[in-house]
A protein has these predicted regions:
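Acidic-aromatic substrate-binding/catalytic surfaces of carbohydrate-active enzymes
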Residues: 41-43, 74
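Beta-strand/loop substructures that line and gate deep hydrophobic ligand-binding cavities in soluble
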Residues: 122
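Short, aromatic/basic amphipathic alpha-helical patches
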Residues: 137-153
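N-terminal-proximal low-complexity accessory segments that begin disordered
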Residues: 37-41, 130
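Intrinsically disordered, low-complexity repeat and linker tracts
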Residues: 1-31, 40, 149-162
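Structural signature of tandem-repeat unit edges
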Residues: 30-32, 45-67, 77-90, 100-114, ...
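Structured segments of extracytoplasmic/periplasmic soluble domains
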Residues: 71, 75-76, 98, 145, ...
Length: 162
């Protein structure tokens, strides 16, 4: 008999399964069971690079990663590079707060709708934030949101992406 799937619940903390092994590098919180969405809630990685994926698989169900949770990378002194997946619409309050060695962030500007307070406060001076956007207008809108979220003394780069 095949194992029974446990139904997902809203606000449940889940970990993705890769190659039949549970990944302990990151935790996700279920945000919408019907829409199959999750928030990247925290990392346990000791790696210098982190990739917030487009999707994760839990109990055989593919879930879209649509947000970086509040304080997800806050105070992380190891992380240097973060790449956010194409489905991210929200970056939570203090998501990268005082991640003082964080020197490179890549975001998809076409999908981001909101960025929480102090999300980028305390990242490394001259941190390079690459914004992938469909056009300069969208790029400028996201740069404004990132600056408002505490990104002082950072460099921005525009990368055209449909």
């Amino acid at each position: 008999a095949s194992p029974t799937k446990t139904p997902l619940k809203k606000n449940q903390t889940v970990k993705p399964v890769k190659n039949n092994k549970k990944s302990d590098a990151a935790s996700y919180k279920v945000t919408d069971v019907k829409k199959k969405t999750v928030t990247y809630s925290k990392t346990k990685t000791t790696s210098k690079k982190a990739v917030v994926p487009d999707t994760i698989t839990v109990n055989g169900t593919k879930l879209k990663v649509t947000a970086v949770g509040a304080s997800a990378f806050a105070g992380n002194k190891k992380i240097k590079t973060v790449t956010l997946g194409k489905n991210i619409t929200k970056i939570g309050t203090k998501a990268f707060y005082k991640a003082k060695n964080l020197s490179q962030i890549t975001v998809n500007g076409n999908t981001i709708k909101s960025i929480g307070k102090n999300a980028f406060s305390g990242v490394k001076k001259n941190c390079k934030i690459t914004v992938r956007a469909k056009d300069k207008k969208q790029y400028n809108k996201i740069v404004k949101l990132i600056k408002k979220a505490g990104a002082k003394k950072v460099k921005f780069a525009y990368k055209k992406k449909k």
